[in-house]
Every structure is written in C-alpha cells, then in structure tokens.
C-alpha cells in the first residue's frame, strides 16, 4: 500500500490473531528422543509447506555445509509440499538434514518446543503480501527464530517488530549455519528471543488485542466522519 503512495496516516494495520492456544507443557527431551534428535544436536526446524516460494534448496545446501564442517547443526523439514521429493533427492542422504511428516496439533506444538531454533526460509526476491502463518505458531512456542529472507520483506519486518529472532539473507546457506551456531553458543540470547516472541504473541497477536485494534479503528473512523 505504501508503494502505491497512499498517505501513511491513511493506512492502519491490524494483524490476524493466532489460532493456536498457549502451547501445552511438554517434555522436550522425550519429544527429541521420539523424533530421533540427539541431545547434542542443534535442531533447526522448518515447518509447513515445501513449495517453490520457500526456496528450501538453501536449507539443503546449508545441511551439506554443516556436514562437511562437522557442525552440530541439524536441519529438519517438517510437513509436505510439491517440492518435498525433489528436496529429498537433492539432500542425497546428508546426516545433517531429516524430513518429518506433518504431525497432529499437540505433537506439532511439542516438536516446535523441542527444537532449538525455528526457521522461516524464503526464496530470494520473494515479496510476500502477508506474514507467513508459521510465524504465529513459532512465537507461541517460545523458541528463537531465524528468518532467511530479504531485507525489507514482510517477514523481516515482523521479526524486527517482535524481537523474536535473527534475520539472515535469503539464499545464503553459510549465514544460516552461523546464525544457528551463534544461538547455540549464546543460550541466554536464545531464551530472550524466544521470550520476546511469546510476549509479542500474547500482546499483539492475541484475539483480544486484534479486537481492541478493530474497536479503536472503528471509533477513530466514526469520530473523523462526525467532524
């Protein structure tokens, strides 16, 4: 809308609220064991669609670099999509990448909570008109986020607004590994980012907050028309 030169004061953004309840408490160690994730592995989990737009070849390349470098980082792609089989073939059996089928809701939330880092990965040059829905799920988990996305993208803006994670350039697999390793080496920062995301979810992405913003918008509009 801003690119169409609409006056800034005429634009009001009201975020969709998250459909997920607060994540139930779960045993992260038990979940990791069930999913085959090692206690000493740094699990970077991407959930959701595996399509063209996600550009997940970047993750495959990052996994290959991680294996060659002897990194503790392991990437997990959870879900399905029209690119999944192609990604499996391109991965070529690397030990630093695994695929997990879509899970029932409770198991899905447990998996998010058990991961060390949650990932949004986008194809370079992709400019979304909306925030990826996975981000609201990520924030609910209380885990830090890495967003591999172009600067100035909608996703980059949401990461900055929430303070919930780190942004790296889209299509840069080594930057992805460095970001994951930096969070693993700084657990205090990781906890802070995760807590920021949960706070953002509760204060900005809750149904109560969204309805309050709608009320405020309608009242402001009514008052302006009454002048």
Segments from the language model and where they lie:
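Carbohydrate-associated surface elements
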Residues: 14-17
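C-terminal alpha-helical cap of glycosyltransferases
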Residues: 207-227
């Amino acid at each position: 809308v801003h690119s169409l030169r609409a006056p800034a004061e005429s634009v009001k953004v009201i975020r969709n609220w998250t459909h997920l309840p607060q994540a139930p408490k779960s045993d992260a160690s038990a979940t990791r064991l069930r999913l085959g994730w090692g206690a000493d592995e740094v699990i970077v989990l991407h959930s959701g669609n595996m399509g063209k737009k996600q550009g997940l070849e970047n993750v495959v390349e990052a996994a290959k670099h991680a294996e060659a470098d002897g990194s503790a980082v392991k990437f997990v792609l959870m879900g399905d999509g029209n690119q999944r089989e192609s990604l499996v073939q391109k991965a070529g059996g690397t030990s630093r990448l695994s695929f997990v089928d879509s899970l029932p809701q409770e198991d899905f939330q447990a998996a998010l909570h058990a991961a060390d880092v949650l990932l949004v990965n986008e194809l370079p040059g992709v400019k979304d008109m909306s925030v990826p829905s996975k981000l609201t799920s990520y924030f609910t988990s209380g885990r830090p986020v890495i967003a591999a996305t172009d600067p100035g993208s909608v996703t980059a803006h949401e990461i900055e607004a929430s303070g919930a994670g780190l942004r790296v350039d889209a299509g840069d697999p080594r930057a992805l590994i460095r970001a994951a390793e930096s969070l693993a080496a700084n657990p205090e920062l990781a906890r802070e980012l995760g807590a920021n995301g949960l706070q953002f979810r509760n204060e900005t992405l809750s149904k109560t907050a969204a309805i309050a913003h709608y009320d405020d918008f309608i009242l402001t509009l009514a008052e302006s028309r009454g002048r």
